[in-house]
Amino acid sequence: MNKEIFDLKMGRISKHSYVDFALWGGIVGDYDNQPGSVKNNMADLVDLHKCGVAAFKGFTCPNGDLFPTVNMGNVRKALEILKPYGALCGFHCEEFGQVLEREKEAKAKTGRTSEEKIRDFLDSHDVWTEYVATKNVIDMARATGGRVHICHVSHPMVAQVVKDAIHEGLPITAETCPHYLGFTEDFV
C-alpha cells in the first residue's frame, strides 16, 4: 500500500524465493463506514509504481481490514494518477452499497451474517452487485483513459459488459476463475 510495505514484502520474499515473482500494489479506499479504515493511499501510487509493482488492485467491496474498499472517486483518482505511467489497475467489482443493504436484510431475517451461511452470502453478493460495479469501473476507464483489469468475472452478463467495452476501444481486460466455470451454488 506504500513504499515501506513494498520494501518489507520484497525483502522477505526475495530471501526465500526460488522462482520469479512480481507484486501488485494495493489501491486503498477511504470509506468512512469501515471499522479501522485507513485513509486512501493515492499519494503513494506513483512511488509504488517506481518500486516496480506489476500492477495495482483495489476492491469495490470489503475484503478484510488490509484492503479498505475503494469508492468510484478513489477509482477515478487512481486511474488519473497512474495513466501517465501506463499502469494497469485491477478491480474486484462488487457494488458495496448493494452488498451492505442485502447483508442487513439477510441478518434481519435470519440473525446471521452473510459469512455464516453460504446462501446468505450468495444472495448479498449477487450478479447485480458485480454488474453495477463493473459498469462503474468501466465508466471511470472511459472518463480517464486509464488501463483497467476486471478481476474474477463470475457471470456471462458481466463478461458481456467487458466485451462491449473492449469493442468500444477502451483499455480493458478481464479474467475469471476456474471454479466459476465448473461449480454451482449446489456444489458449494
Model regions: which residues?
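Histidine/acidic residue-rich metal-binding segments in metalloenzymes
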Residues: 39-188
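Metal-associated gating/positioning segment near the N- to mid-region
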Residues: 1-16
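A glycine-rich helix N-cap at a beta->alpha junction
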Residues: 12-26
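Secondary-structure boundary/capping motif
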Residues: 1, 33, 66-67
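Active-site beta->alpha loop and helix N-cap motifs at the rims of alpha/beta catalytic domains
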Residues: 25-32, 37-38
